[in-house]
Amino acid sequence: QEIAQFVPIEYYYEMVEHRKLIDTLIPPKGVLLNMGFSINSRGADYGPALSQNNDALLFTSQREELSFEINKSKNEDLYISYLDAYGTWSKAYAMEEINSNYNEGSACLSADGNTLYFSRCDCPSCYGDCDLFSASLKDSTWTDIKNLGINVNSLSWDSHPSLSHSGDTLFFASDRLGGFGLSDIYFTINKDGFWTQSQNLGPIINTRNNEVSP
């Protein structure tokens, strides 16, 4: 007599539930993926910042580009990559209008993408070790590069700018005298096109240690 073979009904229901979890082969959110050599290099790449629409990626890099300049030292430069319609990031390229023989890094964009805030270090127009600068995008070219001034910058290190969504408040890190720790978070407010005297965010935010990258 032939013995009937069957799968217990509870196993069948369990298989159905597991099958619901199998959606696609696209890695789920939360999985860390290396962005590959279109973004990364053999040098240090860090300080990423996205545009408000998440379609532009700014970052700082110490990569060594091919150069025929004698005794050219490796420094920090700003790079940018754009997200295409297929969800692929373009090959990052140097922001030539911004980069100089000095160190540039830690950038952020305004909501409309037309104003760039970044830090530049050890330059003749710097008040301190590193200062905050701005640049304007006109006809697809970054121009009107200027120091944000003594109201914002100090005689020490000022870097890591981060703009509020409203675009009127700029947060940044500084190790200037008078802080609560080694480096603190400060802010400045734009009123009628001018940045006000920067202020410390206070002991609720800052500690006796380092606060950076707001």
Predicted regions, residues:
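Short, conserved micro-motifs composed of acidic
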Residues: E2-P214
